[in-house]
Every structure is written in structure tokens, then in C-alpha cells.
Design a protein with these regions (language model features):
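Long, repeat-rich segments with strong aromatic
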Residues: 227, 233-265
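Short beta-strand segments
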Residues: 21, 85-86, 135-141, 322-327
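Condensing-enzyme catalytic core mediating Claisen C-C bond formation in acyl metabolism
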Residues: 1-55, 153-233, 238-241, 274-291, ...
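Short acidic, glycine/serine/threonine-rich loops at helix termini
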Residues: 31-33, 94-96, 146-151, 214, ...
Length: 360
């Protein structure tokens, strides 16, 4: 039997809700000192995470988030059918080295800072299609490894313009499944469930590559805002919704500069999301006291805010339906140095509150 789940031009509406079984967030001290510090599972004081290199540190923090998400659901690595993970480093090395010991079938992803949306989208399709009982989605970033990869060595001490964002040192991981998570207890289970309330993924809108010709690697918000606009507008059109049909629309890391551009672009399309919009990069830091300029960025920005703040907020009845839109600037060292622009992409995930029947 052919199940048609496409919705509009580029979205999918799942016939069966995809349950977020558990989630975990791991960050460093700077993120722990920010406004959301109390929401994260683990705050590590050592930016090296007990390793000798920045890259190994990022691998370690992603592994910690993945293992914690698995542990919260009372599972083992052998219970997970697939792992979708990615990061900002070349050949997704933080993910491949970080998760190698887990021995879980692995798909390495690259969507820049949109990777958490990419992993949740692919994981949800696999769950709804019956290709796994439990699927792990994870992403990470590290301030120092990203600076080393894309910008300047830390010892160089370059000046950062106000449009620049601060790469989050953090990771987020989620376990997806086709059944409601078990009730949490005080001993072994800390699942994403509050009595009968769970969080489910009900739909996705896959991002398109949008290139407005920006070439400023220190203004990622401007590169990503057109992609966020395109995806949000298509999501609203495909699902026949208004911005007010979402309690909140969370973008990944547009920052203050990108948010302004996003509002202007969506206004041109006839949408005003200003009353429901929040940006993970603007939430995770206090720009005034932490000197983060336009806000936070990185794969770990949207992922850690989702796992630490947004998903728990859904089961605590803070929001009934949200749109999670992590945003990515597809910055390549090679193409950038050859003079090419930096295209953007954004993937949207619809996450809703779900009430489990009393007998379950």
C-alpha cells in the first residue's frame, strides 16, 4: 500500500507521530554561564574535555551527549538501529571519531549549523517508514575547533565585527522512536515524558540551497536569513498555517543581524513572525555581559537549546506546537578562498505536544 505523506511542494506530514524518547545536552562553562545555563544536563569546566586537542574535545562532548540520551531511556547502544550525526569539521571528523566506539550504524551528515534539523528529519522519516525502533540524532560544535577550521588560530587575537557570532561549545542528542517513551522514574529512566505528555515530530519541511551572494564569513546571519525565510514561508504554505498557529518559531543561529533580515524578507512574502520568533543563538548567551556580539552559532547551538530548553518546555506545557528551524551557512574553506559566495540552508521540524492515552 502506497502511503502518500507529502504535503504541499516540499513538506512531509507524518501519518504516525514520531516520539522523542529522550534528549541530552552537554555544554562548556561559557554556555553554562548564559541565560539557559540551568537547563543543560552537563556543564564541563574544562574546554578540552580531558583531551589533548580541540577536535578530540568536540568528539568527546558529542559522545557524552549521545550516551546520556541513550542512558536516559534505559537503552544500550545495541538497541539503536541508526545514528544520524554531523558537525562543522572536515569530513565530519568530530562525529565519526566521537561515535566510533558506540558501534551504531552511522550516517555522517553535513548541513553546517542546520545539521540537527537534517538529522531529525531523516531520523523521523526512518521511524515513520518502519526502518528502526530507535534512532539517535546528534550534532556538536566547539568554539576553538571551529575557529581553527574556518577563521583564525586563537592565539592570533583577531578583532571580531559586531555581526560576528560566537560558536557554541556544545552538543545535543535525541532518541526517536515509534512508541511513547516509558514513564520516567527516580532510578534508571529520565525520558522525555511528563505524566501523559510527550513531544512528537509531526512534520518536516526540507531546506533548499539559497544563495544571495554573501561573501562575509564573519556575518553568518546575513548568509542564513534568506534560507530561513524560504523554509519558513514554504512550511506555512504547505501546511496551510499562519505564524500564530505556532506557539514559537525557533531559528538556529541567525543572531541579531540575521533576525532583522529574516523579518524584512518574510514581511515581503506577507508573513509577520515577530511575535512568535525566537533564535537559539540569541537565547543561549547574554550578548551584553558575555561579549558574543550578534549571538551564538554552530551545530551545537540549536542542538543544545533544543535538547536542554525547547523539548522539556513542550512536555511542561510551555508550548503546544513549535517550529524548529536550525539554519546553516555552507561555508567551505576552498570555495570561500576561491571567491565563491556562502549559500545558506534551513530545515524545519514541526514538534508538538502529545497526550498519551491513560492505559499506556
Amino acid at each position: 500500500m502506497n502511503r502518500q505523506m507529502t504535503c504541499g511542494t516540499s513538506s512531509i506530514s507524518f501519518q504516525n507521530p514520531v516520539f522523542v524518547q529522550s534528549c541530552a545536552s552537554v555544554v562548556s562553562r561559557k554556555e553554562g554561564e548564559g541565560p539557559l545555563g540551568a537547563y543543560f544536563d552537563t556543564i564541563c569546566e574544562d574546554p578540552m574535555f580531558g583531551t589533548d586537542t580541540w577536535e578530540a574535545a568536540e568528539s568527546t562532548l558529542q559522545k557524552q551527549a549521545a550516551l546520556l540520551a541513550i542512558k536516559k531511556n534505559g537503552l544500550t547502544c545495541s538497541d539503536i538501529q541508526l545514528l544520524f550525526a554531523g558537525d562543522l569539521l572536515a569530513q565530519t571528523s568530530a562525529s565519526s571519531f566521537g561515535t566510533a566506539d558506540l558501534k551504531i550504524p552511522f550516517y555522517g551528515l553535513f548541513g553546517a549549523c542546520s545539521t540537527m534539523g537534517e538529522s531529525l528529519s531523516l531520523g523521523s522519516m526512518c521511524i515513520d517508514g518502519g526502518y528502526g525502533k530507535y534512532i539517535l540524532c546528534a550534532t556538536s560544535s566547539h568554539f576553538a575547533s571551529a575557529e581553527k577550521e574556518f577563521r583564525f588560530p586563537l592565539g592570533y587575537g583577531n578583532q571580531r565585527p559586531l555581526s560576528a557570532t560566537w560558536t557554541v561549545t556544545g552538543a545535543g542528542a535525541c532518541i526517536l522512536g515509534y512508541e511513547p517513551p516509558p514513564r520516567p522514574n527516580n532510578k534508571t529512566l529520565n525520558t522525555l515524558r511528563n505524566r501523559n505528555i510527550c513531544a512528537v515530530i509531526t512534520g518536516i519541511t526540507t531546506g533548499r540551497l539559497i544563495d544571495f551572494g554573501f561573501r562575509d564569513s564573519l556575518n553568518m546571519g546575513a548568509c542564513m536569513a534568506p534560507a530561513a525565510c524560504d523554509t519558513i514561508a514554504r512550511n506555512l504554505q504547505d501546511f496551510h498555517r499562519k505564524p500564530s498557529d505556532y506557539d514559537a518559531i525557533f531559528t538556529g543561529d541567525l543572531g541579531m543581524v540575521g533576525q532583522t533580515i529574516l523579518f524584512d524578507l518574510l514581511t515581503e512574502k506577507g508573513f509577520d513572525i515577530s511575535s512568535v520568533h525566537q533564535d537559539c543563538g540569541m537565547l543561549i548567551y547574554d550578548s551584553q555581559t558575555q561579549d558574543t556580539h550578534s549571538g551564538g552559532s554552530g551545530c551545537g547551538c540549536a542542538a543544545s537549546v533544543l535538547a536542554g530548553y525547547i523539548l522539556p518546555g513542550i512536555i511542561q506545557k510551555k508550548w503546544k506546537r513549535i517550529l524548529f528551524v536550525p539554519t546553516g551557512a555552507l561555508l567551505s574553506k576552498v570555495s570561500f578562498n576561491e571567491g565563491d559566495p556562502i549559500p545558506g540552508i534551513a530545515h524545519a521540524v514541526v514538534i508538538e505536544q502529545y497526550r498519551v492515552p491513560d492505559m499506556m
